[in-house]
């Protein structure tokens, strides 16, 4: 959420940010927000004036009653009207503040000055790579669906029977390989990169979604259990960031870094016409998430560190990849800057997004009221929050299956995963 003071002082900058994000149509929201903010200011002033009047006259009434000099009936009647007006103003102010908050919640984050200009994903900018590793693929490569089916390790048909399209089933050594990936990533981030492991709930309340920015803008993408007021998490970013919602963090303990495995659930509304085969687009997938809470001045250094931690997984697995910087028209509404890590799919002959690494600056912290005190004499300030997929297993599995297959249809296990699988080949 943007700071209302920033919007008051920089309305043109906010509108320019909306233009860069290809959201020019939301510019009237800024004007409406400022109008409502001015109304609120006038309403608060009127309420304060009336309360001051009531306090002053109440003393006069008390003095009249104490001395017995004259009647206080007229003043009492006037103060009754004043109290009624104050009550009406309080109700109107509450409704107005709710409208202002809803408007604030719908505005996207500021963009960092280094975010490239662009209208869509086609204008994203290569940041690093391509990073290549040698794999002997001098034969027709099977895609992950063909290989997974022939080896008996993936079963999308039975997943569809159970739940519908987009819900994969891992079987036998495929299930073991998936678990190995998850454990390898968690161990790497906790042992080598300094993250504290968290195993969070997979369902959250609406306040948690609101805090990280998935609500209300992405409400159509989450699975909802209305009877219980709960939502299936689209990413572990939601519960892990909300661990500290409403808290003032100890400055001496910053940065705080968490790594968490979770299943992720996404409705993928609006995906009609996109490639939905196999792991390319699913409703349920596994992901290891990295979440960081930092001082504001340290957040962009932290962004590069988190990116490096995600890359380290791919380097260890020898999965070819590249890193792109998302342009202003493709970056998510919540992020001030974002990198995508894309893994190479030889069967699809294209790169597939496997990780996003984002700096939200104080956007989520303001929504979630997560603060810290720089020192004992300072007022609390908002932290900066960051997160990165480290990584999602679905598209990572696509690249792994395609790069580690053999000409005779077997699958070699990456060296880094052998201690976790207990086997070296799937056939």
Curated annotation (Swiss-Prot):
Pathway: Aminoacyl-tRNA biosynthesis; selenocysteinyl-tRNA(Sec) biosynthesis; L-seryl-tRNA(Sec) from L-serine and tRNA(Sec): step 1/1. L-serine binds at residues 235-237, 289, 389. InterPro entries: aa-tRNA-synt_IIb, aa-tRNA-synth_II, aa-tRNA-synth_II/BPL/LPL, Ser-tRNA-ligase_type_1, Ser-tRNA-synth_1_N, SerRS_1_N_sf, SerRS_core, tRNA-bd_arm. One of its GO terms (biological process) is selenocysteine biosynthetic process. Keywords: Aminoacyl-tRNA synthetase, ATP-binding, Cytoplasm, Ligase, Nucleotide-binding, Protein biosynthesis. GO terms for cellular component: cytoplasm. It catalyses: tRNA(Ser) + L-serine + ATP = L-seryl-tRNA(Ser) + AMP + diphosphate + H(+); tRNA(Sec) + L-serine + ATP = L-seryl-tRNA(Sec) + AMP + diphosphate + H(+). One of its GO terms (molecular function) is ATP binding. ATP binds at residues 266-268, 282, 353-356. It comes from the Bacteria. The keyword Aminoacyl-tRNA synthetase applies. It is found in: Cytoplasm. It is an enzyme of class 6 (ligase). Its EC number is 6.1.1.11. Catalyzes the attachment of serine to tRNA(Ser). Is also able to aminoacylate tRNA(Sec) with serine, to form the misacylated tRNA L-seryl-tRNA(Sec), which will be further converted into selenocysteinyl-tRNA(Sec). Consists of two distinct domains, a catalytic core and a N-terminal extension that is involved in tRNA binding. Belongs to the class-II aminoacyl-tRNA synthetase family. Type-1 seryl-tRNA synthetase subfamily. Homodimer. The tRNA molecule binds across the dimer. NCBIfam families: serS. This is Serine--tRNA ligase. The gene is serS.
């Amino acid at each position: 959420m943007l700071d209302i003071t920033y919007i008051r002082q920089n309305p043109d900058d906010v509108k320019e940010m909306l233009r860069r994000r290809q959201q020019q149509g939301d510019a009237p929201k800024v004007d409406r927000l400022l109008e409502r903010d001015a109304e609120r200011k006038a309403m608060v002033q009127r309420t304060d004036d009336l309360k001051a009047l009531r306090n002053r006259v109440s003393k006069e009434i008390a003095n009249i009653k104490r001395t017995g000099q004259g009647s206080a009936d007229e003043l009492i009647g006037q103060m009754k009207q004043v109290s009624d007006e104050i009550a009406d103003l309080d109700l109107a102010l509450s409704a107005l503040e709710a409208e202002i908050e809803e408007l604030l919640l719908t505005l996207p984050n500021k963009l960092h000055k280094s975010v490239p200009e662009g209208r869509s994903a086609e204008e994203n900018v290569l940041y690093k790579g391509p990073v290549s590793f040698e794999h002997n693929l001098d034969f027709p490569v099977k895609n992950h669906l063909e290989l997974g089916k022939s080896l008996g390790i993936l079963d999308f048909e039975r997943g569809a029977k159970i739940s519908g399209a987009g819900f994969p089933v891992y079987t036998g050594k495929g299930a073991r390989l998936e678990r190995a990936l998850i454990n390898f990533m968690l161990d790497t981030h906790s042992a080598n990169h300094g993250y504290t492991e968290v195993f969070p709930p997979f369902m959250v309340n609406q306040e948690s979604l609101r805090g990280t920015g998935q609500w209300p803008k992405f409400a159509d993408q989450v699975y909802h259990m209305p009877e219980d007021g709960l939502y299936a998490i689209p990413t572990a970013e939601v519960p892990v960031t909300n661990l500290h919602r409403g808290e003032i963090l100890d400055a001496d303990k910053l940065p705080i870094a968490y790594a968490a495995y979770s299943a992720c659930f996404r409705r993928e509304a609006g995906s009609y016409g996109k490639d939905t085969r196999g792991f390319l687009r699913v409703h349920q997938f596994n992901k290891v998430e990295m979440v960081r809470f930092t001082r504001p001045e340290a957040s962009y250094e932290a962004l590069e560190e988190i990116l490096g931690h995600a890359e380290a997984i791919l380097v260890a697995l020898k999965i070819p990849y590249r890193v792109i910087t998302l342009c202003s028209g493709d970056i998510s509404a919540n992020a001030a800057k974002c990198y995508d890590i894309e893994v190479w799919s030889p069967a699809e002959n294209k790169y597939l997004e496997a990780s996003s690494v984002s700096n939200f600056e104080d956007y989520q912290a303001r929504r979630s009221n997560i603060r810290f005190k720089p020192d004992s004499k300072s007022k609390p300030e908002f932290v900066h929050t960051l997160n990165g997929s480290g990584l999602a297993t679905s598209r990572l599995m696509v690249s792994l299956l395609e790069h580690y297959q053999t000409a005779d249809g077997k699958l070699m296990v990456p060296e880094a995963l052998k201690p976790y699988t207990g086997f070296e080949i799937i056939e």
